[in-house]
Amino acid sequence: MTIHQIAFSPTGGTRRVSELLCSGIEAKSILTELCVKEEELCLPSIAAGDLVVVSMPVYAGRVPALAVERLNAVESNGATCVIVAVYGNRAYEDALVEMQDVATAQGFNVVAAVAANAEHSICRMYGAGRPDAADARELASFGRAILERVQGGKPFGRLALPGNRPYKQGCSGPFPVANQDCTECGVCASQCPTGAISADNPKDNNNQLCIGCMRCVSVCPSHARGIGESLKVLAARLEPLCRDRKKNELFVS
């Protein structure tokens, strides 16, 4: 049985959660990163007997449409699947049921789900440092529990998950921009998964293409990208919702 990690991780938190979870399943796994430029996307070859861990970030209670689109290009061959929704210490709302529906429609056999925390991708003070050492231990224990269930031989039932169908309405933005510290090095343009940043003029941002994933913000060597004064407004609005430490959750069929 080969372990596949399929992650859409613009700022690194989702990938880190996936790695920690898989550390409890198997020492070695194959990672496919979906948050890359389209021409760099390399889809995995999955066999029916493999175990696939699909991890996505939560944006306002939903998962990114681009992540869904790219997962839909993966041939599942009926492989066993674990879905992981990673959120920034606010709420995951309908993300898990959306991932369940998408993965099931793609032919995966979804037998377990995890809701886990990482630093908020915009307001980094919320969930700061997560996944931390305590999360690492817990996520590894989740991985061991999942492996035990998969290898146990008992038939799987339909996984019951919290969330609503139909899903809540998604939203877009805020969109990051470059400030006066931008050196036009082009790193952001080379890393943007949608091509929203021009390589010829990295200070220009196409908001029709931008999904607000903050990939460009996380990779900028000059720390010259962000959402400006909107950060203070958003942080104040989120503070009562993100103040308390949220728990990680495991669901197994």
Which residues are covered by each model-predicted region?
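A mid-sequence, solvent-exposed acidic-amphipathic segment
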Residues: 157-194
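FMN-binding flavodoxin-like domain, especially the glycine-rich phosphate-binding loop
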Residues: 2-36, 43-172, 228-253
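Iron-sulfur cluster-binding cysteine motifs and their immediate structural context
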Residues: 178, 187-205, 211, 215-232
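Charged, low-complexity surface patches
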Residues: 91-92, 181, 209
